[in-house]
Structures are given as C-alpha cells and as structure tokens.
C-alpha cells in the first residue's frame, strides 16, 4: 500500500475536518450506518475523541464503539479514474460504510487501511461516509488489555476485601490497559480520497547498496511498460532503467547519514502507462557485526529518545506542527535517534526523520503480553495471528525509509515465567521480520526488568535491548546500589557477545520541584540518575546506545502511581526542558554518532 501523493496522474482529497460523532456501546452494529447519527456532536478528525469535550467525562471514560459520519462528494473531473478511500489509522478496530454498505474492516490501531470505492462513489455524487471504531483492549488485541475483574496497569484494589470485590462486580465496564499510557482512540491519522488511473502502480520496493547499486521492484496492475528514473536531491536524472524490476547504478553516490552528517535523499520516479509515482529513498547500509552496529560500515552509537504520540486536546491525533517541533527539539538535544514506543507512528513522521537525519527504532504495538506467573500468555492469549499481521503491516509500510534502522517486535513481554513458550512465540516473529524486510535490517525485542538469567529469548536477538529502572522502581533513590546492580547485570550481557543498549530508563520528575539533595521526583534527582547510569554505560565497549524514557511527559490511565500522567519526560508535556534535559544535551554534544567506543 503506497502512501497517497498528488501529481500529474493522481489526485488526493483530504477528508479531515469536523465530523459528526456519537458514542455507542459495546453492541457492534448499534446504529444504522445508512442514516444520520442520533444526537451527534461535532468532533475533529484526525484526533483522539477522548479530550475534545470537557463538558462531560463520557468521552474520556468511554468503553466500546464510537461512531463518526460525514458527507463526501467526488468532483466530476475524477470521471474515469480509480477512487480509493484511505485511513492513516483508526484505533483499535474499525468498520467503514458508504451509504450503509460495508466497504472495509480493520483490526489494529496504528497502520493504514484502504478500500477501492470506484463502484460506489460516482463523480458528482454525494454519499454518506460512516466509521465505527472500538476502543476496547483485551487479550486478543495489541496493545493488550486486561479482562473485566483484573487490574489496569499500576492499579490497586486490595483484592479479597468483600466490599471491594462487590464494588468491582457492580462497576461499569471499562478498559483496563496492561500498559502505561492512556488508551486514546478514534480516527487518529489523515483520511483521504485519492485517485489513480485504471491501470496503476500498486507497490514499490527499493534496496540500495553503498556502492551505488539500487535494486528496485515495481508492482503494477496492468501490462503497461514501466520506466524508472533516479533523481538526485536537486531533481537531476542520474540513472534510469526499464521494467518492473532490476538494478540501477548511481554514479558518485551520496550516502544517507544521521545528522550532523547529510541525510541525502534520492527519488525513484516511476511511470507506468498513465500513472506516475515518486518514491524517495536513501542509500545506506545497516548491519550488526560482532558487538558493533555499523551504519555505512562505521560503528554507530544511538543517542535517543523513547516517545509517545501524545499531546493535550488531540491526544494521539496526527499533528504536523508538533512533529516538526519535536524533531527540532531532538536536534537541539544533540540526539540522533527515536524509538517509536510502543506502536508505529504516523507515516509523515518517518518522512520527516528521513529528511532530517534521525534514526528510528520502529516498534509494533505488542505491549502488555504477560500477567505474571499465574498466566501463560503464549498459551492462553489468542495473539499470534494478529501479531504477525501488525508486524507485516509495519514492515510493508516502512520498508523504504532510510531512517528506519531497527525493527522492534514488541515491548516488555513476560520472558521469565514461561521461557520456552516465550521463545517459541517470539523467535518465529524474529524470523518473519527478516523474511519480510527486503533490506534485512536488524531485529530486536525490548525486554523488561526480570530475571534475565531465565530469559532465553532476548539473547537471540540481533541487538540486546533492555529496559531497566535501577534507581527508580528498583533500589529506589539509592544510586550507589543502582549502579552496583546495573553492573552485575551488564556483566551477564557481556557474555552474550552481542551489542547491547538501554532501550528505556528514566525517573519521574516534577517540573519545578527542587531539593538541596538529589531526592526522588526532583529535577536534581533526574540529573543524578542519568549522570550515574550513563557513566557505567561508557565503560563498556559493546554498549551501543541509550534511549531515555521519555521525550516528554504524557498521559496515562489514572491510578495511585501516576499524578496527571507519567512524569519521566525530559521535556514537560508542553515541551519545556527539565534540568535533566540540559544535562543530556551537554553529554550528547560530547558523544559522536560514529566511533564513540573505538
């Protein structure tokens, strides 16, 4: 599925704006999609619906289906064209109707889906577009939610007290996420109608090599001849070829590198009969060799942020202004990488990272797989098929982005209590990722704080990625003990003879809270936390990167462990730097992207 673009052969019409909206229930087809929604209110698209109306808590606490509706008119000048309706993402399960006819269904809230509506939407005609989305998370969704009667992440219930148990049975149904971020829902990314000629370019794959050779494959629906031209950054043609697949050689090739290097981009200009499509790409290599990660043959050190798509009012909704601001703050911080915790981000963000030279660890929404020793998720949760689906959709969508240098299969599953079952679940996904990716990028799985000696899965990944909270959730506030514990664990990982990086670590920090000593939750403690742990990373030549948790404060489910969300951000939710960010900015200014541990 190609990203929609507008050119001399294709038209793209935005359907973003204000739609009609109504909350439903857990009944799947509660409303008639051929009729106007009852008691509809206005809602903005794209955006989460949860925080758009503070006159009521109903949107914030909604559990079940929510309904969107608007009218759509196709211009008469689209006659003779193929017409496609595309959604960037709808969270988590979606159904779409035109004039009451079901045209699309999709499970998974973070990747695009589309439907050919040529036969249903005639030029000059106005139709009723209805979308229903289900925000419920459970043991069959990714991310995972707990079933009724179980706790949400960081919840509390004093289990066993009769009055509490009775109240739980009487309580209204609600989402109980097994993850530490708010379960925002709705039409989160752009909605477009786009056109193509009847015979069209369906897919493009580009596999460049640093010697300038570029393998390409173009999938089309007709028999029209295919012509491809490589354009340099100035739009000059530098190579060309004929046919749906082949190899092109770029003379005097410019490589793509993260800043402060040059993120040089080429364009593969494709024509097929009346259709035209432009696919940008960068020429770079990424590989693991021994205990090093090599980009263009040079040892790489990741200086990165874990992020969330999260902001006030629009929740997880697509925001190009915020994306640009965040990328500029990443540059300001002297960082070079982002981890898309814990789901694939909007496609436009990857385009920006391509242009701006920011490395991306691209992660599936597989977070929350595990419930402790009492539950074997690999035997009891029906997740494997859906997991393969979301992994395939992510890789297919993002395969041509030079910024993407690492696939993450998921975040913090239970790898300790059922180690063989965990390996049997995750290793086929590891193999599938390598099979699906034409560029064969490294693959990892982000593991949580556990008995790492029992974890037989993480050590099999191309890069060992560990989430650790020494000094915060473990050995809280005692940084001497935290460093001792960290070093003992790092000695274990050294024996695996693989590159290792910290994929998540951090400390909740209340902006403006200062203490004479470095006390927990203060800005001073955040500085001390990073200063002490980072010094230990620097002693290990096989330690190849650090992704701090988190770029900015973000919203979570309410509970006794969270006060207005997670405060581990280096920036506040409105993007003001904390003291710890100034420390990291200085640290990262002294660490080169290449050759740091040589």
Please annotate each region the language model reported.
Residues 1-347, 352, 356-360, 390, ...:
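Secreted/periplasmic carbohydrate-active enzymes, especially glycoside hydrolases
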Residues 7-31, 171-172, 179-186, 193, ...:
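Substrate-binding clefts and catalytic carboxylate motifs of secreted carbohydrate-active enzymes
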Residues 91, 135-137, 287, 308-309, ...:
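Feature marks short, surface-exposed loop/turn motifs that line or immediately flank catalytic pockets
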Residues 106, 357-364, 462-468:
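Short hydrophobic/aromatic-enriched beta-strand-loop microsegments
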Residues 109, 176, 180, 308-321, ...:
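The substrate-binding groove and active-site-proximal loops of carbohydrate-active enzymes
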Residues 134-136, 343, 365, 410-414, ...:
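Catalytic metal-binding/acid-base residues of hydrolase active sites
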Residues 145-146, 352-356, 375-380, 384-387, ...:
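Short low-complexity, flexible loop/linker segments enriched in glycine and/or proline
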Residues 357-359, 365, 440-442, 499:
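Proline-centered loop/turn at the N-terminus of a beta-strand
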């Amino acid at each position: 599925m190609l990203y929609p673009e507008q050119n001399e052969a294709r038209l793209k019409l935005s359907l973003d704006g204000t739609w009609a909206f109504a909350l439903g229930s857990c009944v799947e087809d509660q409303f008639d999609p051929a009729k106007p929604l009852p008691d509809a209110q206005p809602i903005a698209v794209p955006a989460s619906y949860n925080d758009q109306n503070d006159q009521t808590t109903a949107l914030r606490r909604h559990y079940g289906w929510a309904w969107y509706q608007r009218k759509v008119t196709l211009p008469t000048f689209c006659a003779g064209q193929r017409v496609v309706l595309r959604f960037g993402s709808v969270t988590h399960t979606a159904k779409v109707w035109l004039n009451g006819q079901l045209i699309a269904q999709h499970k998974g809230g973070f990747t695009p889906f589309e439907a050919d509506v040529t036969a249903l939407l005639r030029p000059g005609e106005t139709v009723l577009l209805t979308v229903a989305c289900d925000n419920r998370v459970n043991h069959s969704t990714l991310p995972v939610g707990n079933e009724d009667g179980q706790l949400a992440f960081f919840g509390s219930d004093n289990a066993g007290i009769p009055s509490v148990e009775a109240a739980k049975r009487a309580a209204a149904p609600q989402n109980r996420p097994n993850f530490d971020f708010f379960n925002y829902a709705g039409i989160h990314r752009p909605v477009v109608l786009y056109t193509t000629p009847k015979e069209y370019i369906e897919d493009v794959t580009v596999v460049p090599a640093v010697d300038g050779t570029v393998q390409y494959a173009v999938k089309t629906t007709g028999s029209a001849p295919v012509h491809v031209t490589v354009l340099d950054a100035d739009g000059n043609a530098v190579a060309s070829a004929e046919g749906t697949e082949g190899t092109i050689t770029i003379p005097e090739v410019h490589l793509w590198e993260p800043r402060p290097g040059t993120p040089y981009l080429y364009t593969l200009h494709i024509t097929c009969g009346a259709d035209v499509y432009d696919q940008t790409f960068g020429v770079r290599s990424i590989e693991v060799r021994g205990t090093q990660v090599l980009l263009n043959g040079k040892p790489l050190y990741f200086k990165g942020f874990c992020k969330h798509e999260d902001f006030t009012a629009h929740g997880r909704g697509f925001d190009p202004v915020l994306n640009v601001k965040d990328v500029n703050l990443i540059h300001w911080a002297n960082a070079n990488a982002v981890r898309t915790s814990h789901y694939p981000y909007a496609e436009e963000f990857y385009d920006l990272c391509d242009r701006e030279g920011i490395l991306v660890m691209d992660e599936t929404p597989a977070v929350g797989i595990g419930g402790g020793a009492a539950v074997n998720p690999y035997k009891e949760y029906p997740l494997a098929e859906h997991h393969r689906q979301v992994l395939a959709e992510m890789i297919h969508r993002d395969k041509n982005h030079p910024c993407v240098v690492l696939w993450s299969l998921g975040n913090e599953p239970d790898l300790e209590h059922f180690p063989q079952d965990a390996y049997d679940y995750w290793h086929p996904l590891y193999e599938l990722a390598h099979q699906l990716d034409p560029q064969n990028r490294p693959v990892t799985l982000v593991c949580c704080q556990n008995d790492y000696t029992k974890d037989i899965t993480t050590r099999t990944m191309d890069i060992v990625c560990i989430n650790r909270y020494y000094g915060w959730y473990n050995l809280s506030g005692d940084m001497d003990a935290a460093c001792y514990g960290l070093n003992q664990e790092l000695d274990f990982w050294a024996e695996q003879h693989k590159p290792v990086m910290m994929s998540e670590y951090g400390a909740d920090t209340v902006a403006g809270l200062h203490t004479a000593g470095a006390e927990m939750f203060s800005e001073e403690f955040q500085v001390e936390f990073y200063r002490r742990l980072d010094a230990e990373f620097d002693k290990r030549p096989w330690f190849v990167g650090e992704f701090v948790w988190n770029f900015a404060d973000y919203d979570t489910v309410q509970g006794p462990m969270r006060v207005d969300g997670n405060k581990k951000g280096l920036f506040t939710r409105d993007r003001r730097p904390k003291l710890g960010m100034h420390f990291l900015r200085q640290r990262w200014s002294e660490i080169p992207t290449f050759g740091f541990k040589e």
